[in-house]
Design a protein with these regions (language model features):
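PLP-dependent amino-acid enzyme catalytic core
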Residues: 1-310
């Protein structure tokens, strides 16, 4: 039977779960650690899911149509996902981002035909958000998906990512850990898993250098894609029962460990999530449990960063 897709948008989701058996063995872990490899999405990250969801939600509501321009403040992956879907659907897209984002990310965005507007690095995502809002006022027939506030973000994870994890583990998942950028992944997956089994523990991951969720203060860090410096609107703060803080060095080390032990190259925030999962697996009370960590993207977006240059 033929199995042919008609659009890149149809290729999103159903990403694989990998048990890191070599790491489990070498570290003597008593728990199972599974990683969900979101770089298998067509534009290379978990953000493909929300890009498709936000665009199709806007189309259904009549907010996007022929001749529309999509504008979004993004630290990278959401922009790449949006640029890919915009290309597939024929929309103009303008992305605002801090100048501190990696060169690879910028070049990928340009490859998909996106227009980039770089903002002051010291202002972080807040500066990019303000610039996007200004552009939206100036450009007619424009639409800002607004990943930090758009309910279509957590909704797509409730509808796809969460059910995939439940299905692929045959319902045998005890702990789920994911980084908080917009909070959409943790919220959607967490709510779905909790609806299936209220005893599943959900762990929010944030950078040690910007402990907004655990301590209410923001700061500088090197874990691109998480730790936006504020509590995002779409984050359900009641869904998680623990906040795990990852240091820059631990995120880098875990990403390198995965490449060298399992042959899987992932990005910095993925390293942070894996580090969190490994530390959870070391706890005596978690022996025999199954821990799932969501790894947002691959290492090839970070060759110019400290992940590979140090």
């Amino acid at each position: 039977m033929a199995n042919i897709y008609k659009s890149a948008a149809e290729l999103i989701g159903n990403t694989p779960l990998l048990e890191v058996t070599n790491i489990e063995r070498d570290l003597g872990l008593k728990a199972r650690v599974l990683v969900k490899l979101e770089y298998f999405n067509p534009a290379g990250s978990v953000k493909d899911r929300i890009a498709k969801a936000m665009i199709e939600d806007a189309e259904a509501k009549g907010l996007l149509g022929e001749g529309s321009t999509i504008i979004e403040p993004t630290s990278g992956n959401t922009g790449i996902g949006l640029a890919a879907i915009a290309a597939a659907k024929g929309y103009r897209i303008i992305l605002t981002m801090p100048e501190t984002m990696s060169v690879e990310r910028r070049n990928i965005l340009k490859a998909y035909g996106a227009e980039l507007v770089l903002t002051e690095g010291s202002q972080g995502m807040k500066g990019a958000i303000a610039k996007a809002a200004k552009l939206a006022l100036e450009i007619p027939n424009s639409f800002i998906p607004g990943q930090f506030v758009n309910p279509a973000n957590p909704a797509i994870h409730r509808a796809t990512t969460g059910p995939e994890i439940w299905r692929d583990t045959d319902g045998k998942v005890d702990i789920f850990i994911a980084g908080v950028g917009t909070g959409g992944t943790l919220t959607g997956v967490g709510e779905y898993l909790k609806s299936q089994n209220p005893n599943i523990k959900i762990v929010a991951l944030e950078p040690e250098g910007s402990p907004v969720l655990s301590e209410g203060r923001s700061g500088a860090h090197k874990i691109q894609g998480i730790g936006a410096g504020f509590v995002p609107e779409v984050l359900n703060t009641k869904v998680y029962s623990e906040v795990f803080r990852a240091a820059n060095e631990d995120a880098f080390a875990a990403a390198k460990l995965l490449a060298r032990k399992e042959g899987v190259s992932v990005g910095i925030s993925s390293g942070a999530a894996l580090h969190g999962a490994i530390e959870l697996a070391k706890r005596p009370e978690n022996a025999g449990k199954t821990i799932v960590a969501l790894l947002p993207d691959s290492g090839d977006r970070y060759y110019s960063t400290a992940l590979f240059t140090e």
